């Protein structure tokens, strides 16, 4: 499973908040961050299936003869924009459902109130959407590599025939 980390541009904020005794609030924020991404990922399957259905013979041959991540790269090229468009409203809803904005605003407001702190305010919807999509492609790339390199991972008859 992929874990979405605290936003990079807010890492200093995280460190500072933990130092001032807010570890449990930071942990809760990270849990809700990942819950929002998980909600969005359920829509990936239909988008990936559609991309595979639109695949040409040339695409299939390139994937078959390609590197360990050729299929992943194909899916990334064919689906990234559509995944973003589908995921972002779901992420927005999920953020509301799990009160992520409440957690983020509380953390950001307390951090921003500290003297000498560099103010933070990243776009959580965009961050979570992109991290969820990137996480999916990491999982797909790992699975693809395993299928290509390990005959036991080729669990379907079709995969066994393709990689003979």
Segments and roles (model prediction):
Residues 1-5, 63, 158-161:
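Soluble periplasmic/extracytoplasmic beta-strand elements of cell-envelope proteins
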Residues 1-32:
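N-terminal Sec/ER secretory leader and immediately downstream segment
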Residues 23-94:
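Mid-length scaffold segments of soluble, non-membrane domains
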Residues 37, 72, 76, 121, ...:
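Generic alpha-helical structural element
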Residues 82, 86, 90-131:
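An amphipathic alpha-helical core segment
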Residues 132-164:
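A cross-kingdom marker for long, charged
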């Amino acid at each position: 499973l992929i874990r979405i980390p605290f936003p990079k541009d807010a890492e200093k904020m995280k460190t500072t908040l933990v130092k001032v005794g807010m570890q449990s609030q930071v942990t809760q924020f990270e849990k809700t961050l990942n819950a929002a991404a998980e909600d969005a990922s359920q829509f990936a399957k239909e988008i990936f299936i559609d991309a595979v259905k639109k695949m040409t013979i040339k695409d299939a041959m390139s994937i078959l003869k390609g590197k360990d991540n050729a299929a992943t790269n194909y899916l990334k090229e064919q689906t990234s924009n559509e995944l973003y468009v589908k995921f972002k409203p779901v992420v927005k809803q999920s953020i509301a459902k799990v009160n992520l904005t409440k957690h983020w605003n509380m953390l950001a407001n307390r951090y921003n109130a500290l003297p000498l702190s560099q103010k933070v305010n990243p776009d959580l919807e965009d961050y979570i959407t992109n991290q969820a999509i990137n996480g999916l492609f990491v999982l797909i790339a790992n699975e693809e590599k395993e299928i290509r390199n390990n005959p036991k991972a080729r669990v379907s008859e079709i995969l066994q025939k393709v990689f003979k």
